[in-house]
């Protein structure tokens, strides 16, 4: 009789431990997801979503660019003088505003998140019409399309293109990993970025 009681007690204990294990696993998964969403935020979502939609870009790409280039700091100035969330140079901004869109805006507007995101997205769109792969688009955005064109002349096809600059190559890899992370965090479970 005693062994039956122990058997029932052991079975009950195992079931309780399994339930606790499942709950802890679920809670851990939720905590990890929350931490990852903190690390990979969706700040400026209204502007990013609107511009991505307007320029037919995947918003995850725009979030990844902002995350990797400025870490969502609209006042960020890089060592080479690029400004704002999407790290545009004054020269690129003036070329976009004057020659591409005919708007003739002051470069001081690069600090404005809405303006910076809009022109960063437009520049990405421009580069997607010029190049066939996102790796090449990122390389051109990070360096200069003229330099990337030169690199491409040294490669038989764009599909075989290997970025010869190690720093640019590493940054493009990092951006693509961040794009993948945003897609995983904000799209997998129907939680689309908006």
Language model regions located:
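Hydrophobic membrane-insertion alpha-helices, especially the h-region
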Residues: 10-29
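Catalytic glycan-binding domains that act on GlcNAc-containing polysaccharides
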Residues: 27-194
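N-terminal Lys/Arg-rich, disordered targeting/topogenic segments
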Residues: 1-8
């Amino acid at each position: 009789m005693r062994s039956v009681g122990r058997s029932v007690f052991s079975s009950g204990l195992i079931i309780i431990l399994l339930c606790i294990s499942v709950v802890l696993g679920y809670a851990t998964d939720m905590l990890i997801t929350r931490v990852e969403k903190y690390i990979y935020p969706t700040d400026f979502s209204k502007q990013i979503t609107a511009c991505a939609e307007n320029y037919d870009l995947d918003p995850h790409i725009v979030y990844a660019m902002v995350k990797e280039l400025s870490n969502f700091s609209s006042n960020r100035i890089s060592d080479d003088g690029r400004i704002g969330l999407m790290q545009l140079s004054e020269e690129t901004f003036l070329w976009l505003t004057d020659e591409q869109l005919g708007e003739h805006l002051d470069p001081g507007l690069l600090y404005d998140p809405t303006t910076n995101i809009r022109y960063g997205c437009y520049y990405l769109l421009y580069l997607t019409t010029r190049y066939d792969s996102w790796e090449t688009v990122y390389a051109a955005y990070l360096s200069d399309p003229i330099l990337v064109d030169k690199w491409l002349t040294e490669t038989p096809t764009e599909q075989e293109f290997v970025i010869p600059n190690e720093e640019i190559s590493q940054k493009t890899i990092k951006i693509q990993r961040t794009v993948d992370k945003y897609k995983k965090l904000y799209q997998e479970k129907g939680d689309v970025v908006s």
